[in-house]
Amino acid sequence: MSYPNPPPPPKGSASFSSSSSDPFNQTNQLPYDSQFPPQHAFAHPSAPNPGAGGAGVAPPGQGGQYAPYYDNEPEMGGRWEGGGMGRETWASESGWSQNEPNYPPSDYHGGPGYLPSRASTPTFEGSNAGHRPRDPYPAWTVDANIPLSKEEIEDVLIDLANKFGFQKDSSRNVYDFLMIQLDSRASRMSPNQALLTLHADYIGGEHANYRKWYFAAQLDLDDAIGAVQNPGLNRVRSVARRGGKTKNPLATAQEKSLESATSRWRTAMNNMSQYDRLRQVALYLLCWGEAAQVRFMPECLCFIFKCADDYYRSPECQNRQEAVPEGLYLRAVIKPLYRFLRDQGYEVVDGKFLRRERDHDKVIGYDDVNQLFWYPEGISRITLNDNTRLVDIPPAQRFMKFDRIDWNKVFFKTYLEKRSFFHLLVNFNRIWVLHISVFWFFTAYNAPSIYAPSGSTTATTPMAWSMTGLGGFVATLIMIAATLAEFSYIPTTWNNTSHLTRRLIFLLIILAITGGPSIYIAFFNQTGHVALILGIVQFFCSVVATIAFATLPSGRMFGDRVAGKSRKYLANQTFTASYPALGFYPRVASFLLWFLVFGCKFTESYFFLTLSFRDPMKVMNGMKVQNCHDKYFGNGLCTNQPAFALAVMFVMDLTLFFLDTFLWYVIWNTVFSIARSFAIGMSIWTPWKDIFARLPKRIYAKILATDDMEVKYKPKVLVSQVWNAVIISMYREHLLSIEHVQKLLYHQIQSDQPGKRTLRAPAFFISQSEKGSKAEFFPKGSEAERRICFFAQSLTTSIPAPIPVDAMPTFTVLVPHYSEKILLSLREIIREEDQNTRVTLLEYLKQLHPVEWDNFVRDTKILAEESDAFNGGNPFASDEKEEAKKADDIPFYTIGFKSAAPEYTLRTRIWASLRAQTLYRTVSGFMNYSKAIKLLYRVENPEVVQLFGGNTDQLERELERMARRKFKFVVSMQRYSKFNKEEHENAEFLLRAYPDLQIAYLDEEPPRKDGGESRIFSALIDGHSEIMPNGRRRPKFRIELPGNPILGDGKSDNQNHAIVFYRGEYLQLIDANQDNYLEECLKIRNVLGEFEEFKVSTQSPYAAQGHADFAKFPVAILGAREYIFSENIGILGDIAAGKEQTFGTLAARSLSYIGGKLHYGHPDFLNAIYMNTRGGVSKAQKGLHLNEDIFAGMLAFGRGGRIKHSEYYQCGKGRDLGFGTILNFQTKIGTGMGEQMLSREYYYLGTQLPIDRFLTFYYGHPGFHINNILVMMSVQVFMLALVFLGTLNKQLTVCRYSSGGDILPGQSGCYNLVPVFKWIKRCIISIFIVFWIAFVPLFVQELTERGTGRAILRLCKHFLSLSPVFEVFSTQIYMHSILNDLTFGGARYIATGRGFATTRISFSILYSRFAGPSIYLGMRTLVLLLFITLTVWVPHLIYFWITVVGLCVAPFLFNPHQFAIADFIIDYREFLRWMSRGNSRTHANSWVGYCRLSRTRVTGFKRKRLGLPSEKLSSDVPRAPWKAILIGEIIGPICLAILFVICYLFIKSFAVDGQIQPGLVRIAIIALGPIVWNMALLITLFLISVFLGPCLNSYTHQFGATMAALAHFGAVAGMLVFFELLWFLELWNTSHAVLGIIAVISVQRCIFKFLIAVFLSREFKHDETNRAWWTGVWFNRGLGSHALSQPAREFVVKTIEMGLYSADFIACHLLLALLTIPMFIPYFDRVHATMLFWLAPNQQIRPPIYSFRQRSQRRKIVFKYGLLYLIIQGIFIALIVVPIIFKDVAGLTPKSVPFNGII
């Protein structure tokens, strides 16, 4: 195709006359302000000619009106010499006015003046020279009585583009966008109604966001009253103040009332001409189409549109002669806003954009900017550069002042997302009230001994009433704390804080009422009649207060933000609290669910938790320990040890009180969900015979739109085509062999009547009722069986009826893509990943899909034989020997091809790609929509087939046209223009395979001059786009953006830039690792029917009566099921699949019914107009909106959109398969949830939802994560309680009981701790149940969908594969990631793996990844558990041993081939290297690097200095706020250290052989000794390195490493010496020594954290200081002025590092010892592999094949390092065991301890 240079356009066209036919050219008022504007004649001969243009626009750089925008900018690429464009030039440029937009005739070569952006003009493949394609918008033709022709619509867009300076490509894109929407609607309603409803959805209807915003921001006052009386936008009261001066106050008030304003609005909308309606929609879409990041701010966009609309109707605009330059709108309106948003997060350093170190509460984000436009006060803040307020300018002139707005002065934070745990208090205050207050009521009533008069165990009646009644006091305290915290999250303006202040005053009064009587009763009158009355009244007041606070949303107390009638609350109600109402039955179900949950919870908690705690409280309260004494504290601490223990037990009981609510929620939610599945017929327990026998009838009734067809065609004929297409599609995917296909197809057979043929149905439908016959039709347990069963089962449910294909709405599938695999390369398939991988990908896939591989090979062989025969192969080959044939087949069965010709290798690549998580799989799966639409169109319209006779090409073209019209597929390939050669080839392959696939990508043009910014474009290509000489395709549209659109975490920005290319009414958002199937795609019309827009009322949405038909809340999101296709790929894949199954299906089913489904994950369908007018399909602030999709769900829910769930449609979805990648995903979800807790959406939902929906929201979303925190917290608190109880049990004489349960006589001085031991057992059972309840939903889901056998088998496989260990570990990861995020921040997108986890990961990598989140905690808990086991052993503790060991070893347990002996030893060598490297030269993976990185979340980094390679090793981590550091890093560890030291001091407070032992001094010496020793060692080595280093470094590069090795060896030795000293001082009393170690660890941890938090300044990004310390070379390190201060800082760092090094060294060897034990079991590695991969031992992965040299090398390494490993482990064991053996020989006593008992 050649593109001639465009000729100059005509200089000035017809002049524009300001005709009186335009009702809006005399006034600047909105059309809906006058009661009855005159009817606009849209086809009037004197209507404005939008093709006007004029000369006189200054070219860029030559001054003139627009010079400020263009002098420093490169040209847009438009035509500068002569103003605007007319339709004829626009049409000829785009080449698609008269013909199909994307597919002009093949002889078209670009008309005159072809667009500079070079929009593509692909040829219509295969079209004949004389063939003109059908009309692209068949429902919008002159025959259909359309209100405006395509040409008139085009004119409108050209006119708007000329008036506002929209880009040509953007205008063309919007034209196509708008026409497809009109065509989509007009295909099922009249064209007039289509335009009317479209205008109602975008601009004026009941649910249009623009209309809602218009009234919320009180613009009706601004517009109706006019600029004279109301110069600024003020509140109603401001106008009312001047109301007395008006002549008719009543009329003014009437004008101002909301009802009269909405009535005026409706009248004006009803009277508006269709021309104006179209113009408004077109203008809105043009504003939206170039808005870029402003699309995330829907109300800001509404404001821009309002100003543009006002300006358009002004005489100034209508009389304008010349067209404004192209791109003016982008530069004057969008770019300043974009720059403001960009500069919030980034700053320019050395010409590069660097992320600012700001947390969310300092960043004015999209939501803050958007919220400014909600309120009149916000809009009135907008000022120009000369400080004029924009609202003081007449509405019609505001748009032209946008370039002069100073946005930096306008915006402020509207909600402060501070990192704080108080968000949990504010957002979920009702949860805390409900639990803590009720816990108080239960416990206070059952603990009379605590508040009884001294000497008595029973309290007086008034005291009992009053103390129990303090539950209300507690509830009020929680509410006061929540209110005070709320003050810190919202800006303190009077409007915000007035209702908070009112609430606070009221709460203080209630506090006095619920707490005051207790003071009187407790201190003045415990027994009187008045006291009793006061106590009872107090109790009932408390109950009322508790119920009120637990049920009423705090946003509705004292200034109702949700339902208040005041106009000042309207914006809040409109945008945050327009919750869609539930129907009667769902509401009843919602209340019933929570009544059952809390009914069971409170009953069970009272009897199981509270009553069981009664006896321990009774015996522990008042218990004082006798005969104990401490050297420094006397008996002040030790006598109160039972009180400390009781306090910790209280916290434990309260934690369990929270946990069992979630347990009951899981149980009842599962019951409800299963009941729903039976109600809608989605269960295997529906009669099996019924499912298959009736399948043909159901296909006919539910899949086909066959209202009037039965007369002409038998249902069997139609159904057979659909069924055969499904079966053949499975055959093509190699799921079925040819034999299976023959049995499953409908066959044509000879009829009884001569010359006629009839159809025979497959026996499959009938024989399904006969047991045992299923296996004949498809392989047992195969993918084909699963798909056919689900298809049959899904059609038993009630589903919306389909409408004919040509009437169905158009929809788009959108897939964001970054760097996911497009197609696997041959190298990836047939080569191992690295030396730690034992299997190629193809081998692994063949073992996972043996039947499919077999079918594929058979298929390939047939192909090869045909090819051979065609090429003249031997026709008698079949007579040759069978052996030779078998040998010939080997290559087919091993790699899938024999000839390396591309067509054969490509087949193998595609086969593997369709079974991995690739984009090709996604595209090929979702392109089935196109096949389904063609199939349905052909089946339902047999006359179309007859029309084309035998011309299959023309028939295919007609089917293609219909599919293309109804379905679009856009992949947003963010990196497309930066793809490497292989990626580009793969993308090109996709486009050739699927020419209708569209790819949106970012195209970058370098700056024209130095120091300028690159220009970035949003471009679109498809498989029809012309290929240019450079190999790239010519874009169809290329729209300039204001700057780089990727400002956030990437995904939402990627979706947002491509969203302008979607088409139609609905969007399906898909991830690049999903799949779809033909039989599911056949249900697309039923699925779209769920949006309830197929049968639209014929009334006008604006008519006085008709608007009621449109009052229903629209469906915003339709959720769909996901089948996780990685479910059988070993235990981890199955766990990931199980979680998705339970959350995505089981929970979603019940949540959507009771109106609590928020989660919009993929593959959900979206109402595109609804979502795009409300901020788009996801939110995009970096970090805060990490889980971008759920925010779209919350946004839609809060603004009145319904969220439904579809049970009968499901897509495939891939999940992460490796331990690390699954936990990366969970970390991402956990940190994302932490960010959600900070967000304003949670604030609005938590403080405004009614109680039943609030509970559904809480337990369905954040409750799960908070429950994980509480589960792990309960383990920690319980361990602490048991340590205290262990010290009591160890040191005190415990009373013994008889078998009858009575205390035995003659036990003076004993302590009754038996009730406490019973409580311990009950607690362990509770924690055990809470952990294991996680498996119930999966089991029940499997039971209902696949039957008892499959459910039991799956559960057994999980338990045998140690899945509970993984569950414990993942719970800890969830907890760590949330708490870490709430404390330190740093949430970021973690790219999770999409491959198969077959590679063994080295110990050091796993340790460094999981030490912080879990292993350290596990190791500390292990030491606690050892002490507990030694002092309070009960068999129930075995469960805790499994749990805690799981926390330590889970990462290694799920590591492939962890227990192969040779690999283990070689890995040990790698571990020792990891511990020691990075001190002489930089290394990317070293212990010192890991240590630096783990402390940077506290210290933060210094500013980035470009150029040093080691800087790349660390990512940006913002420094944590000091409050977070104070609580998390200083106060927390100090408290723990104090508690453990108290425990140690207690056991040392009893005299042994008459001698009191000095506990405190001993702990101080053992804890501080190693630190002092390390300091001395460091100073010595520092002096050596400074004096010798500069000389010796020139001789050896190992000097630094040697010094570091000496220091680290000394540190480990010092640690062991001091441990041995403790062991000796305790005289080898194991439990005492273990408790001593616990206390020492806690003290050292406390010291190190304190040093890091207080003494360490920010880290350098590079590691020069570390290497300078060891090598002694401090110059030339790039330290600059820091060279003098760094040695002192580095001394503190090295002191900490030495302590941590020795701790890590010992901890790692303990872990390695635990992992060594299973290796003594023969064949354990094989058993372990079976457990991980679920492959039978005979299918297992072969060991790798090594060369002779490699084998010899490995043997040497194994021998050398194996010996070293045994020696080190032997030393550790000897240090513990040898003293025990010789202690009796030595005969030591306390008196033989040296230093005369000082230590």
UniProtKB/Swiss-Prot annotation:
Biased amino acid composition, Low complexity: 12-23
Pfam families: FKS1_dom1, FKS1_dom2, Glucan_synthase
EC number(s) from the headed UniProt entry: 2.4.1.34
Membrane topology recorded in Swiss-Prot or TrEMBL: Multi-pass membrane protein
Biased composition (Pro residues): 1-11
Family: Belongs to the glycosyltransferase 48 family.
Compartments, as annotated in UniProt: Cell membrane
Comp. bias intervals (Polar residues): 91-101
Gene deletion effect: Essential for viability. Knockdown of the enzyme increases sensitivity to caspofungin, activates the cell wall integrity pathway, and decreases virulence in the host lung.
Main location: membrane
One example GO MF annotation: alpha-1,3-glucan synthase activity
Ranges for region Disordered: 1-136
Name recorded for this polypeptide: 1,3-beta-glucan synthase component FKS1
Record text on subunit structure and interactions: Component of the 1,3-beta-glucan synthase (GS) complex composed of a catalytic subunit FKS1 and a regulatory subunit RHO1.
GO BP term (any one): cell wall organization
Organism: Cryptococcus neoformans var. grubii serotype A (strain H99 / ATCC 208821 / CBS 10515 / FGSC 9487) (Filobasidiella neoformans var. grubii)
A cellular-component GO term for this protein: perinuclear endoplasmic reticulum
Membrane-spanning intervals of the chain: 431-451, 470-490, 504-524, 530-550, 591-611, 648-668, 1268-1288, 1323-1343, 1422-1442, 1446-1466, 1527-1547, 1563-1583, 1605-1625, 1635-1655, 1704-1724, 1762-1782
Enzyme type, top EC level: transferase
pH relationship of activity: Optimum pH is 7.75.
